[in-house]
Amino acid sequence: MSPRKTYILKLYVAGNTPNSVRALKTLKNILEVEFQGVYALKVIDVLKNPQLAEEDKILATPTLAKVLPLPVRRIIGDLSDREKVLIGLDLLYGELQDSDDF
């Protein structure tokens, strides 16, 4: 069995809006179910830290970025569809590969 990777994620939000709160809640649920402690999530409020959004070229919120493992992947907007989030971040393939016990 190969060692599990640690996933480094950044969630960019704009304040404490309903969309931001929903995105964070949904994402935490996905991460706890799918990655059980092998992730680090940094939430960045672009209203409080606009320089970080500018450095990372964030144009819309919410934006979720998978920084590590490479390649970097981003999802912009609605994070409510678990499968789309996992596919968009290139995480579902590994999950499927690990469960090939047919």
Swiss-Prot record:
Lineage: superkingdom: Bacteria
Location within or outside the cell: Cytoplasm; Cell membrane
Gene Ontology annotations of biological process type: circadian rhythm; entrainment of circadian clock; negative regulation of phosphorylation; regulation of circadian rhythm
Induction of expression: Transcribed in a circadian rhythm with maximal expression at 12 hours and minimal expression 12 hours later; expressed as a kaiB-kaiC opperon. Down-regulated by KaiC.
Effect of loss of the gene: Not essential for growth on low light, loss of circadian cycle and rhythmicity. Cells elongate.
Effect caused by changing G88A: Stabilizes the KaiB(fs) form, disrupts KaiC phosphorylation rhythms, forms a complex with KaiA, wild-type regulation of SasA, disturbs regulation of CikA, dominant-negative over wild-type protein, restores normal cell-length to disruption strains (i.e
One Pfam entry name: KaiB
Swiss-Prot/TrEMBL keywords: Biological rhythms, Cell membrane, Cytoplasm, Membrane
Effect caused by changing L11F: In kaiB1; shortens the period of the circadian rhythm to 21 hours
Function: Key component of the KaiABC oscillator complex, which constitutes the main circadian regulator in cyanobacteria. Complex composition changes during the circadian cycle to control KaiC phosphorylation. KaiA stimulates KaiC autophosphorylation, while KaiB sequesters KaiA, leading to KaiC autodephosphorylation. KaiA binding to the KaiC CII domain yields KaiA(2-4):KaiC(6) complexes which stimulate KaiC autophosphorylation. Phospho-Ser-431 KaiC accumulation triggers binding of KaiB to form the KaiB(6):KaiC(6) complex, leading to changes in the output regulators CikA and SasA. Circadian oscillations can be generated in vitro by incubating KaiA, KaiB and KaiC with 1 mM ATP. The cycle is self-sustainable for at least 3 cycles and resistant to temperature changes. A very robust clock is reconstituted with KaiA, KaiB, KaiC, SasA, CikA and RpaA; output is measured by transcription from an appropriate reporter.
Domain remark text: The C-terminal region may confer species specificity; C-terminal hybrids do not all rescue deletions in S.elongatus PCC 7942. Has 2 forms, fold switches to a thioredoxin-like fold (KaiB(fs)) when bound to KaiC. The KaiB(fs) form binds faster to KaiC than wild-type, thus less fully phosphorylated KaiC forms; the KaiB(fs) form activates signaling through CikA and inhibits signaling through SasA. A mutant locked in the KaiB(fs) form binds the CikA PsR domain.
Additional remark text: 'Kai' means 'cycle' in Japanese.
Family: Belongs to the KaiB family.
Protein name, entry field: Circadian clock oscillator protein KaiB
Species for this entry: Synechococcus elongatus (strain ATCC 33912 / PCC 7942 / FACHB-805) (Anacystis nidulans R2)
Taxonomic lineage: Bacteria, Bacillati, Cyanobacteriota, Cyanophyceae, Synechococcales
